[in-house]
Amino acid sequence: MSSGANITYASRKRRKPVQKTVKPIPAEGIKSNPSKRHRDRLNTELDRLASLLPFPQDVINKLDKLSVLRLSVSYLRAKSFFDVALKSTPADRNGGQDQCRAQIRDWQDLQEGEFLLQALNGFVLVVTADALVFYASSTIQDYLGFQQSDVIHQSVYELIHTEDRAEFQRQLHWALNPSQCTDSAQGVDEAHGPPQTAVYYTPDQLPPENASFMERCFRCRLRCLLDNSSGFLAMNFQGRLKYLHGQNKKGKDGALLPPQLALFAIATPLQPPSILEIRTKNFIFRTKHKLDFTPSGCDAKGQLILGYTEVELCTRGSGYQFIHAADMLHCAESHIRMIKTGESGMTVFRLLAKHSRWRWVQSNARLIYRNGRPDYIIATQRPLTDEEGREHLQKRSMSLPFMFATGEAVLYEISSPFSPIMDPLPIRAKSNTSRKDWAPQSTPSKDSFHPSSLMSALIQQDESIYLCPPSSPAPLDSHFLMGSVSKCGSWQDSFAAAGSEAALKHEQIGHAQDVNLALSGGPSELFPDNKNNDLYSIMRNLGIDFEDIRSMQNEEFFRTDSTATGEVDFKDIDITDEILTYVQDSLNNSTLLNSACQQQPVTQHLSCMLQERLQLEQQQQQQLQQPPTQALEPQQQLCQMECPQQDLGQRHTQINGSFASWNPTPPVSFNCPQQELKHYHLFSSLQGTAQEFPYKPEVDGMPYTQNFAPCNQPLLPEHSKSVQLDFPGRDFEPSLHPTTSNLDFVSCLQVPENQSHGINSQSAMVSPQTYYAGAMSMYQCQPGPQHTPVDQTQYSSEIPGSQAFLSKVQSRGVFNETYPSDLSSIGHAAQTTGHLHHLAEARPLPDITPGGFL
């Protein structure tokens, strides 16, 4: 790699074209220099050749002789390529009517191609295998700042960063391995051009053109004249290698070479443009001026953006008539800098468009020399958005002693050099006659100043261009409202007064009204017929009338009077704490406020739970004498209180009850350790106590726990297409004690005839509570004495006692449950923290979902 001092990049070249004038033919008999005649003929042919190039005249005037020859060769090569690629024959271009139609079609295609280039976020680039720019679209100037004529048929390595040249050369090779060129990277860096020895391939050595590995997508940095930070712009190249037809190149032996591969790619900026930049990126226009900045020409884009024709633009006089008064001195400073140095630098100002609209532009003007002397000015303008223009206006250094827009300029010894609209005090006289008498005294005539002076250009401007509302008045209104609101009150006052639209409107304009009243001396000095008042225009845009000002004054008076009398205004009350407290309480109680699903108040639920806790603690000593049904009634009620209501959309048929009326033969108590309950996530509220649940009346002690966590799961899962229910009747015996519980067991469990069980119609299903089917699907049981088996009885819908249950079941779903017939008895086990175990012969109940409380 060579040192950085020897690396050069492409730059803008300032050329001084030779004056092209037709010299008279010398008279006969007068001797002339043969070499001079040869040079004259050569210059004449070059001028004629340059006029045939498809470039604007201002570009052609800057071309030197070598550039004319280079661009001519490039144009002929491009034409040969399209002749072969489009398969156009000379016969297609012959004939009168056919030729006319072909010209119209070509013109339409040309217009469509221009529109496609403008819509494209990037430019088109074609690079040959020897790294020459075969073609570059004209939009390359919008991204890199180079003219199309500056890069065509030049080495592409002059535009590429030194660190990316090797990668670009690798992408040009069809196999991504340019190993044929020795020290190619070093040769590229030092020579800034293609390798000295080019390698040509025959079609047999190259893959098909439509092969997938001929596609290319890579990134590299290109030289950018528009970027003042680094001078390079990261671009993404996406395209493919294709054959470049019609070049008719010859080898060293004179043989015609076959078409070679070239990179056809679209280069787009790596950083996508913002939404605001998309609208203005393709509207760079150029204007031509005299040395005093008088317009003398404008391109088509400038006429489209500004709305003027070239005649309207060039017959107005000084170009400062199209510049905003606040930007005149700023542009004059750049104008002087351009006369001294040849280039003005980036200048941001406002240009006057047609229909009295101001457009922010970023301009760069430079001098064009002819015969060693400045001839004219070429200015390149790029439109900006209003937001960008205001940002540049804020960043502009206030080194100038004054601005025209503020009324502080005292350039000439006159009383007031401004027109009435430029008067810093916008308050006018009341009568029209006094205004007419005053205007001639303060407005100087056009003949008072030099025609090319800034004051003359300012006076020649129409007053209406400063009265016309801007295209986007939202920023002005937002700043105006923000300033007024900040001075009128805090956000609490605005929040309290948000219910009244009129009060809010008065608050927003309070500061502006105070300023207006201070200038005028009172509301009587403000008249709606004063249309030239800037403040009145703003008030009119906001929908504010002078009656609103009087109402505002009355409101201020009454508010001041109430404050003086000691009355407390509701606006002065700080309700922030109350609002935050209410929101916090609402968030804390969000889990208890499911009003759509709950049927009992939260307070009633909590109070009943505490009351039941106290009652159950008092009854622990009396449980030995109580029947099991009476002991289970509070438990059933507590379960109803404890279980929260589920969503109404999840409706399952639930049966609330317990095995209160069933009695195995031996005394059995059921152990329910806390650790095991926590393991199964059934009783999350138990805190380190193991409780026993009674299953028969002979139990000596049967304490139970009051704090139960809800286990909201259905008793029986829903099944389809069957109404048959099989319940196990084995290992269960009827109770020896008469049942007194309000919850009898389901009548479908058929038992001996001496006792019948049915559904209690009075038991309200308050909540979709769940139920343990004997607690046999979750807990394993210790073996105990054998019980008298009861034959399994099948449920039938024909039994009268079961019609109530069947109607309830069929209203929610159809069940088809078959319980295993072998059920072991439950033995009494000591209170322990260990796990319970099933019998080896006991089968689990996978289809029964455990739920509820015992």
Curated annotation (Swiss-Prot):
bHLH domain span: 26-79
Q: Where is this region: Required for maintaining the overall integrity of the AHR:ARNT heterodimer and its transcriptional activity?
A: 49-81, 116-124, 264-266
The subcellular location is: Cytoplasm; Nucleus
Which region ranges are annotated with the description Disordered?
1-38, 432-452
Show the ranges annotated as biased composition (Polar residues). 440-452
Mention one GO biological process in which this protein takes part, according to its record: positive regulation of DNA-templated transcription
Q: According to its record, what is known about the domains? A: The PAS 1 domain is essential for dimerization and also required for AHR:ARNT heterodimerization.
Q: How does it assemble?
A: Homodimer. Heterodimer; efficient DNA binding requires dimerization with another bHLH protein. Interacts with ARNT; the heterodimer ARNT:AHR binds to core DNA sequence 5'-TGCGTG-3' within the dioxin response element (DRE) of target gene promoters and activates their transcription. Binds MYBBP1A. Interacts with coactivators including SRC-1, RIP140 and NOCA7, and with the corepressor SMRT. Interacts with NEDD8 and IVNS1ABP. Interacts with BMAL1. Interacts with HSP90AB1. Interacts with TIPARP; leading to mono-ADP-ribosylation of AHR and subsequent inhibition of AHR.
From the Swiss-Prot or TrEMBL record, give the protein name: Aryl hydrocarbon receptor
Q: Which organism is it from?
A: Mus caroli
Q: What does the organism's lineage look like at the top?
A: Eukaryota, Metazoa, Chordata, Craniata, Vertebrata
